[in-house]
Regions:
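Flavin-dependent oxidoreductase catalytic cores
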Residues: 1-89, 93, 98-109, 117
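Rossmann-like dinucleotide/flavin-binding elements
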Residues: 6, 82-114, 153-161, 165, ...
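Short, hinge-like loop/turn segments at secondary-structure boundaries
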Residues: 8-9, 31-34, 127-131, 283-285, ...
């Protein structure tokens, strides 16, 4: 975009801020014709603006070394260290960061991934309206795998026997949706967020989302999106938020016009606090505003009783009610996938857990990429 702005003569200079947190070599790579190696800012705000407004050191989700360059150093293997054979199991954000960083340092790295593509949870995230740029992170890591010489084994589910020859095993095997202990959770109208985003199971017109964390909000945006996303279609964004790019309206402000939501959605949480209170400090408000625009019912203080043909039976504000819904989507947390750990440790192998396999309570790409990078830097 910046190149096009200059080429079109629309500006003499393009200023950037967050993109240089994501990749300090942005300009050098562009000048060298290596734009495909730029670690692109995904506009998430999670480690830059959110940190700033919390009084924390500014950094970057996709580049944890930003503002920590003298602390988190990536040095070639030397001295009392020796190059190791490293197996990284799982090619999500944590595994990708670990594998590429370890290989840059001189370790011999093999990356195992049971899927036929890299990305893990980012392959789900990039489908969410407004998160399309997450695909750029996978493009970046794909190129880094090539450049750093990581041996990538896609479509291969590693077993303990496959990993015996490695000096270090890193389990970045991710998570699986947590199934709550609610009567009727096995009813045909119940699906998980993974069923919806990955497997594309059909979803009805009336939907209840159990769980209003980050995943719940993402699924709500996904299910209510009607037509192209405003993140990739500026005219849609302008219409939704009442922006008159022609300035025919006073101050460039016009009456918002929005598509009707694709579905009727209720976003439910057990906690009695404000729905979405745990979202990012600088982005939570926009998610809640979008939900309001799309007529999503955001309901706190819900006790789930059972699910049956009639719908979702619950207690809300002390009153029993039945939500007449076609589909119930479980966004009720995750469980770590780390079955290999016990067998590997029993064999005496060095095993490290990173990403969701380490802490599955809330999916956190910032923590995952930081963990992967820091571990690789320490090997």
């Amino acid at each position: 975009v910046a190149e096009q702005v200059l080429a079109d003569g629309a500006a003499d200079m393009v200023s950037m801020a967050r993109p240089f947190l994501a990749d300090a070599d942005f300009v050098a790579k562009a000048a060298a014709g290596q734009a495909d190696r730029i670690n692109t800012c995904i506009a998430c705000n999670q480690a830059c603006l959110d940190h700033t407004f919390q009084g924390l050191i500014t950094s970057c989700l996709v580049n944890p070394r930003a503002c920590h360059e003298t602390v988190l150093t990536i040095e070639p293997v030397a001295g009392d260290q020796s190059a190791k054979r490293v197996a990284v199991v799982g090619a999500g954000p944590a595994g990708l960061a670990c594998a590429t960083t370890a290989s840059k340092r001189g370790h011999q790295v093999t990356l195992f991934e049971s899927d036929d593509q890299i990305g893990g949870q980012f392959n789900l995230a990039k489908q969410i309206p407004g998160k399309e740029e997450f695909a750029e992170t996978l493009r970046y890591f794909g190129r880094e795998l090539e450049e750093t010489g990581v041996e990538v084994r896609l479509g291969e589910r590693a077993t303990a026997a496959d990993l015996t020859a490695y000096d270090v095993v890193v389990l970045a095997t991710g998570v699986t949706p947590r199934i709550p202990d609610v009567e009727g959770v096995d009813h045909p109208k119940v699906v998980t967020y993974l069923d919806v985003l990955r497997d594309k199971v059909p979803v009805g017109e009336k939907v209840a989302l159990m769980g209003a964390g980050g995943i719940g909000f993402d699924v709500a945006e996904y299910l209510t999106q009607n037509g192209p996303s405003g993140a990739v279609a500026p005219e849609v964004f302008n219409a939704e938020w009442g922006i008159d790019a022609t300035y025919a309206s006073r101050g460039g402000l016009a009456a918002p016009t929005r598509e009707e939501p694709a579905r009727s959605v209720a976003l439910l949480q057990r906690k009695e606090s404000k729905v979405g209170a745990g979202l990012g400090k600088t982005t939570g408000w926009i998610h809640r505003a979008t939900m309001a625009q799309r007529k999503v019912a955001m309901v706190p203080g819900v006790t789930y009783e059972r699910i049956d043909d009639l719908g979702l039976h619950a207690v809300i504000n002390g009153e029993r009610t039945v939500l007449d819904v076609d589909t119930v989507v479980l966004c009720t947390g995750q469980e770590p996938l780390r079955e290999l750990q016990a067998e590997l440790e029993a064999r005496g192998q060095v095993v490290h857990l990173i990403g969701g396999a380490d802490v599955a309570a809330e999916l956190d790409a910032k923590r995952a990429i930081q963990q992967g990078t820091e571990l690789a830097a320490s090997l």
